[in-house]
Swiss-Prot record:
Residue ranges, annotated region (Linker 12): 229-251
Keywords for the protein's UniProt record, in alphabetical order: Coiled coil, Cytoplasm, Intermediate filament, Keratin, Phosphoprotein
Name recorded for this polypeptide: Keratin, type I cytoskeletal 25
Family affiliation: Belongs to the intermediate filament family.
Positions where Phosphoserine occurs in the chain: S442
Region (Coil 2): 252-390
Function of the molecule: Essential for the proper assembly of type I and type II keratin protein complexes and formation of keratin intermediate filaments in the inner root sheath (irs). Plays a role in the cytoskeleton organization.
GO cellular component annotations of the record: cytoplasm; intermediate filament
Example of a GO biological process term: hair follicle morphogenesis
Localization per record: Cytoplasm
Length: 450
């Protein structure tokens, strides 16, 4: 309902489709499609009902005629016809009011049905009973957990097989390296054996040379002895008175003893030199073999430590990779679940916002209809006051205006009442037609004339 003041620049109009109220001087007009006009005492009064819809129902479609009252009196001419017309107008007015109340009741019933259907206990997407889906959801969760566990076990078995293969590969590499090391050691010992064999051959050659020299010396000694024996065995008989000569046998024996002692000494020296060289060479070989064995043991130990560390590193890397895969899979699952929950929350918020918007719109429509009802009740009271106003005959709870009789109306018209109701809704509007402030003033003056 809106109010317009022709004398100022302020206006009121929250909903242009619900009706309008215009004031001109001391009069008021209500209009929204159907009009019924009643000139008042010293003023003009017009009302309109219609174009009010609720749930697809429309009220008011035919205009009602008006009745006039002059300033000199309430009735003029044929009072019976006038009262009949007045009763007809009032009956039509009350029928419109009753239809509006029925539309209001229908709207309330629809709102109640909507709350029963989409209320807090049955709103779609908000409080549905999902208990029947809980076993299915639990079964699906168990299947997902079982599948995830089986997948994790398969991944773990694959990682274990990979680690075992890596361990065997490292063992093979270590054994191969150890085999190559042993072969290199054997080759080194073979070279040492060749050197020793060469030394032995050299010593044997020296021994043979010394043996041949000894044999040659013995042969020369034998030949000299034979020559000396032949020279001493002739028939020369020389007698001389001289000193006794040297005994050649003793001399030869002495020479033989010297040569034998010299040969024995040479043999001993050669044997001692050979033994000394062999001992030093054997000691050097033993030391080299010990150093080689120690170095080989150290190398083997270092390789074993390296193998152990590499196995541990591979195991830790595989564990790290498995944990990263599990973490990535878990994050993906939780992100998917979070996105699903967020989508459900967004859908529920959208439904809740839509429900709130519809509820607020229906609330506003209900308040507007209630305001219209209140204004109509006030208009009925004002109408009753204007036509003589019996307090028991005109009430908003029971509309019995069709039972008015012409005689009663004639009695009521004997005491006319003049009532002026002025309602002002003031709105301050800027240059862009934007409402700044709204104020409502209601002034009512009653006077009774004899």
């Amino acid at each position: 309902m809106s109010l317009r003041l022709p004398s100022g620049s302020r206006r009121a109009g929250p909903r242009p489709t619900t009706g309008s109220l215009r004031l001109s001087g001391a009069g008021a007009s209500f209009g929204a499609g159907n009009a019924c006009s009643m000139p008042g005492i010293g003023s003009s009064f017009s009302c309109a009902f219609g174009s009010s819809s609720s749930g697809g129902n429309a009220l008011g479609g035919n205009p009602c005629a008006g009745f006039t009252m002059n300033e000199g009196g309430l009735l003029s001419g044929n009072e019976k016809v006038t009262m009949q017309n007045l009763n007809d107008r009032l009956a039509s007015y009350l029928e419109n009011v009753r239809a509006l109340e029925e539309a209001n009741a229908d709207l309330e019933q629809k709102i109640k049905g909507w709350y029963e259907k989409f209320g807090p206990g049955s709103c779609r997407g908000l409080d549905h009973d999902y208990s029947r889906y809980l076993p299915i959801i639990e079964d699906l969760k168990n299947q997902i957990i079982a599948s995830t566990t089986s997948n994790a076990n398969a991944v773990l078995q694959i990682d274990n097989a990979r680690l075992t293969a890596d361990v065997f590969r490292l063992k093979y590499e270590n054994e191969l390296a150890l085999h190559q090391s042993v072969e290199s050691d054997v080759n080194g010992l073979r070279r040492v054996l060749d050197v020793i064999t060469l030394c032995r051959t050299d010593l044997e050659i020296q021994y043979e040379t010394l043996s041949e020299e000894l044999t040659y010396l013995k042969k020369n000694h034998k030949e000299e002895m034979q020559v000396l024996q032949c020279a001493a065995g002739g028939n020369v008989n020389v007698e001389m008175n001289a000193a006794p000569g040297v005994d050649l046998t003793v001399l030869l024996n002495n020479m033989r003893a010297e040569y034998e002692a010299l040969a024995e000494q040479n043999r001993r020296d050669a044997e001692a030199w050979f033994n000394e060289k062999s001992a030093s060479l054997q000691q050097q070989i033993t030391e080299d073999v010990g150093a080689t064995t120690s170095a080989r043991n150290e190398l083997t130990e270092m390789k074993r430590n390296l193998q152990t560390l590499e196995i541990e590193l591979q195991s830790l890397l595989a564990t790290k990779h498995s944990l990263e895969c599990s973490l990535t899979e878990t994050e993906g699952n939780y992100c998917a679940q979070l996105a699903q929950v967020q989508a459900q929350i967004g859908a529920l918020e959208e439904q809740l916002h839509q429900v709130r918007t519809e509820t607020e719109g229906q609330k506003l429509e209900y308040e507007q209809l209630l305001d219209i009802k209140v204004h109509l009740e006030k208009e009925i009271e004002t109408y009753c006051l204007l036509i003589g106003g019996d307090d028991g005959a005109c009430k908003s709870g029971g509309y019995k205006s069709k039972d008015y009789a012409a005689g009663n109306m004639g009695n009521q018209m004997k005491d006319p009442i003049r009532a002026i109701v002025v309602k002002k809704v003031l709105e301050e509007v800027d240059q862009r037609s934007k409402v700044l402030t709204t104020r409502l003033h209601s002034l009512e003056e009653k006077s009774q004339s004899n």
